[in-house]
Design a protein with these regions (language model features):
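Conserved core of the PLP fold type I
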Residues: 130-263, 274-276, 281-289, 293, ...
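Hydrophobic residues at beta-strand termini and immediately following loops
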Residues: 101, 167, 212, 298, ...
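Active-site PLP attachment segment
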Residues: 62, 288-323
Length: 462
């Protein structure tokens, strides 16, 4: 029986993790391996794409494809390093490491690679000469139309294609919004805890950055009104807060909208994990409740499709389209038209909706595996709060505050979790591990992964 792409992927992954294939080793060319295994080239392409996406392989152009030279594999016989307090740097570099349980990574084994490759081929063959010039800074218009249609249907927005601006992702969107509308004297508030990479970016570009606590109902709007009523921008994740996974309550949504309208402030709504709710319908966005056009909505395709796509969007309030256009002309160079054409076809032909529906069911199953495995391996050392969706869980420590040390132990075992306390800037910290689960393929695999750092974890927490 001929191997499928998942069989090829599994063989290479296992050989790499066991050390049979070492960092820097060259792997066969796609054509050569396809001929040897007597399978279609697309089968090998798909397997290699998953391995590359997970960081096991790197493509080096004419030099071929190799096992990632920077791959860190666990050495179970090596003595554990002592914590050095440098976890924030490791959180940043984690995005480029291979490993498991990394938050925010979609299920790479379940993406419709063959369909995507087919659309890529069609888009490439259909490229016109004029599309090979500089891309439009606001984005390829058919993609802007497709995104507007998707947001109108699934997120309850009432927007036109003219209000949609295509960006390079989260950082590109946030930079462009602030470059367009903010001055250096403006006060900006951010959730605490809040998205770690967002914090790092804002600390570099916003002189007056302040935080507002988050509780079980989302960002504390009473605190915002007491301490930061004069803020010009509030950056929030109302649908699925990052990282605590709570949903902003309806009374607080209305309170936030009233504040923005009365003070001519802007709310930047980051639709973090907004597509992934498992036990109820996808919630309408905060923007859909906005009667005064004070909400700037932003999202990406990093979690719904793949991180390497580097494609995001901003829904501009109608009154700001001119300002955004002028700023984008100066500060951005547009996104590749070919990639935008592939994504447009993926949306317009219904593949995106079908993929999301499949992923919601799959992620709910994999989340349940991870929570059950965590309980079986660690008993009551961790606890989780049942939330309705998202792409990660927070395993809170039941005692102690050494989540940095625990996270470091797990990272040494190739488990790329985050320490929750690193996502806080103010007081009132909670302690635990932020972990992804989307690429855990079975309950048994979840158990095996969690067993890796068990000895060191028990030593720290008991």
């Amino acid at each position: 029986m001929k191997p499928g792409y998942h069989d090829i992927y599994t063989r290479y992954r296992d050989n790499i993790t066991r050390g049979v294939l070492k960092p820097g080793d060259k792997v066969p060319a796609i054509r050569v391996l396809a001929e040897e295994l007597k399978v279609a080239r697309k089968t090998v392409e798909t397997a290699y794409a998953i391995l590359t996406g997970e960081g096991y392989l790197v493509s080096q152009g004419a030099r071929g494809t190799r096992v990632n030279p920077d791959l860190l594999l666990p050495d179970n016989n090596a003595p554990a390093e002592q914590p050095t307090g440098t976890l924030p740097a490791s959180l940043i570099s984690q995005r480029e490491r291979a490993g498991f349980l990394r938050p925010g990574i979609p299920a790479l084994d379940s993406f419709p690679y063959k369909k995507w490759l087919l659309l890529a081929g069609q888009a490439t063959r259909a490229m016109r000469q004029e599309e090979m010039l500089n891309p439009p800074v606001l984005g390829w218009y058919p993609l802007r139309q497709a995104i507007a249609s998707y947001l109108n249907i699934s997120r309850g927005l009432s927007c036109t294609a003219e209000q949609v601006l295509i960006t390079s992702g989260y950082s590109g969107s946030l930079r462009l919004i602030l470059d367009t509308l903010a001055s250096r004297s403006d006060k900006v508030v951010f959730e605490d805890p809040g998205y770690f990479m967002g914090q790092q970016l804002l600390k570099r570009i916003v002189p007056r950055l302040h935080t507002v606590p988050v509780d079980r109902c989302g960002i504390d709007t009473d605190y915002l009104l007491r301490h930061h009523r004069d803020a010009r921008f509030a950056i929030i994740t109302p649908s699925h807060q990052s990282p605590l996974a709570v949903t902003l309550s309806l009374p607080r949504k209305q309170q936030l909208l009233d504040w923005a309208n009365q003070n001519e402030a802007w709310i930047i709504e980051d639709d973090y994990d907004g597509e992934f709710h498992y036990t109820r319908k996808v919630l309408p966005s905060l923007k859909s409740l906005d009667q005064h056009d004070r909400v700037i909505f932003m999202g990406t395709f990093s979690k719904t499709i793949m991180p390497s796509l580097r494609m995001g969007y901003v829904v501009m309030p109608a009154s700001t389209v001119g300002a955004f256009t002028d700023c984008a002309d100066i500060t951005t160079s547009g996104q590749p038209v070919l990639t935008q054409k592939i994504l447009t076809a993926f949306l317009n032909e219904g593949h995106f909706f079908r993929h999301l529906k499949k992923m919601r069911a799959l992620y709910q199953t994999r989340r349940d595996w991870m929570i059950a495995a965590l309980r079986e391996v660690y008993g009551d050392l961790f606890f989780t709060e049942q939330n309705d969706g998202g792409m990660h869980i927070v395993a809170f420590l039941t005692k102690g505050s050494c989540d940095r040390e625990v996270a470091r132990c797990w990272q040494e075992q190739q488990l790329q979790v985050n320490a929750l306390s690193e996502w806080y800037r103010g007081s009132g910290k909670r302690y635990g591990l932020v972990m992804g689960y989307n690429n855990v393929r079975s309950y048994q695999e979840a158990l095996e992964l969690l067993e890796r750092p068990k000895r060191q974890t028990l030593a720290l927490l008991n």
